[in-house]
């Protein structure tokens, strides 16, 4: 897993924007001597108003796939993203039109995400049908066994992950033998027929380890789990078609070691996982509501 604080950091790429009445020209330069593939280009929409309902992105006059995302759930789109493949030492200009009417355009999905409550009336492990987008639980409530595949799962054609909905919040791995989206069909638990057909499977035993990586506390000698929180929320912010965004919020987190020098008061931590199409790495952003200079993680 890869932890980043910046929304996007593309080494060797630079962008400039010219705007006229919500018509944008986005120029992207690859200054490196190697090609760059599946590079996410993310545009902050705050300067362009709160009435954006649709976006059209074109390269050389041809429309390409793009995605609008409402990150904070206020009904306004915060970011526009699209994916760029760039030859070495090249410059490409993308034309973006922002519209205040209509609906977001639809494109072939290159990513997938789901959260599913366990339906005990459905016996099959990959035919569960109680889909949700968000769940918040109180202190002391552990929904791990009530969640099918134990929390939100998300994938692109190369990789697939899930996040445990409990005090570990570990990122677990689903291995693939071939490129393609599989979780909608396997729901993380491949049956015999699917295995014979070449589908992937849950390949990592996590336990109390860090799995592929997770954010935890540190008491000076060892990591601490996120056991004492006022509320824990896991939600899917975006389902695609170009990126999935999954968020974990630990509201009022109190370390089990009590009021020591590292954790003198409760804090709220938000961990956001963004997976783009065509990439094996997952962008992880961690935000804190309070100052945490005296905390260790």
Where are these regions (language model features)?
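Bacterial Sec-dependent N-terminal signal peptides
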Residues: 1-25
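Alpha-mannosidase-like glycoside hydrolase catalytic domains involved in N-glycan trimming
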Residues: 21-126, 137, 142, 149
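Residue-level recognition of well-ordered beta-strand positions that form the cores
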Residues: 27, 44, 97, 247-249, ...
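Short, exposed beta-strand/loop patches in secreted or surface proteins that constitute
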Residues: 65-73, 145, 152-154, 232-239
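Solvent-exposed N-terminal domain segments of exported/luminal and surface proteins
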Residues: 95, 100-226
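Gly/Pro-rich turn-and-neighbor structural signature
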Residues: 132-139, 249-251, 283-285
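Extended, loop-rich substrate-binding clefts of extracytoplasmic carbohydrate-active enzymes
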Residues: 194-278
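Acidic (Asp/Glu-rich), glycine- and aromatic
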Residues: 269, 273-275, 280-297
